[in-house]
């Protein structure tokens, strides 16, 4: 497993994809419900990785602290699980949710943290983890991988709006994806046109529930009573770190770019865990 320290979490209260183009485009992109949900989840992951998990690791060195380590790990799992649920709620295509998001503003993240710390609410929140089977189905249409302006692989959403490029010294495949001979600069510029950004975010918002379900239903996080001590602390810590790693890659897909998470992005996409279509082999 890749050490958690190798994950490059953002250093700010409002993380933006490093490939997000101009500030105006980035702000418009950030206001979309789905991307906002991913950013809040990414902030939670950043805080969890930088503060809670290092404490767990240090305390876990002492053999007489197994009970305390297990409790802290379970609290971390509950917090991360509640963050996933919060992301699902924020991404729902509801006008009421959109208006609520505008009015609540920065208070939303604090409310999400309060829900995570309140053990009494976790039973109700956990019911959202088991989604109806149609929510797990991916769209039948996909657009193949393209390149960003820094020449790193990224996943193009199936709903991305094709842009009418010039025909000089360029090629395109059947799905309308720019060919490799095209200028990387032009690909980057047009990938962040407003209509393309909004279409990608809408498509990714539709896939959010499936992505979250893939993490949680695969038992990467311990689900159940926090007082249950059947799972050894070592195995519990491995599951939690795996969930954080998977969530980091999900955030990368959400931003439609591999935002510094390393080479495992390609491995996860190859396994079709979060892909919007068939795996690229």
From Swiss-Prot:
Keywords: Host nucleus, Late protein, Virion, Virion tegument. Belongs to the herpesviridae US10 family. Phosphorylated. Its main location: virion. This is Virion protein US10 homolog. It is found in: Virion tegument; Host nucleus matrix. GO terms for molecular function: zinc ion binding. One of its GO terms (cellular component) is host cell nuclear matrix. Residues 97-119 have a biased composition (Basic and acidic residues). Induction: Expressed late in the infection cycle. Residues 90-119, 136-186 are annotated as: Disordered.
């Amino acid at each position: 497993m890749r050490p958690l320290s190798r994950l490059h979490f953002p250093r700010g209260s409002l993380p933006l994809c490093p490939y997000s183009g101009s500030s105006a485009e980035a702000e418009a992109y950030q206001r979309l419900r789905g991307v906002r949900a991913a950013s809040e989840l990414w902030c939670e992951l950043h805080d969890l990785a930088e503060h809670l998990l290092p404490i767990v690791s240090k305390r876990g060195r002492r053999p007489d602290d197994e009970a305390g380590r297990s409790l802290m790990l379970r609290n971390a799992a509950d917090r991360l699980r509640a963050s996933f649920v919060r992301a699902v709620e924020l991404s729902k295509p509801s006008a009421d949710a959109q208006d609520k998001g505008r009015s609540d503003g920065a208070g939303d993240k604090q409310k999400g943290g309060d829900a995570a710390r309140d053990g009494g609410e976790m039973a109700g929140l956990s019911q959202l983890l088991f989604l109806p089977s149609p929510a797990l189905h991916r769209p039948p249409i996909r657009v193949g991988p393209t390149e960003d302006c820094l020449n790193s692989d990224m996943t193009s959403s199936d709903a991305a709006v094709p842009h009418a490029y010039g025909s000089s010294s360029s090629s395109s495949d059947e799905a309308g994806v720019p060919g490799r001979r095209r200028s990387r600069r032009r690909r980057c510029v047009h990938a962040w046109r407003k209509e393309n950004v909004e279409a990608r975010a809408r498509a990714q918002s539709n896939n959010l529930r499936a992505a979250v379900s893939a993490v949680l239903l695969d038992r990467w996080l311990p689900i159940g009573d926090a007082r249950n001590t059947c799972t050894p602390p070592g195995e519990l810590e491995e599951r939690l770190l795996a969930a954080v790693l998977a969530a980091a890659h999900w955030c990368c897909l959400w931003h439609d770019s591999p935002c510094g998470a390393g080479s495992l992005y390609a491995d996860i996409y190859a396994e079709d865990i979060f892909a919007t279509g068939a795996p690229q082999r």
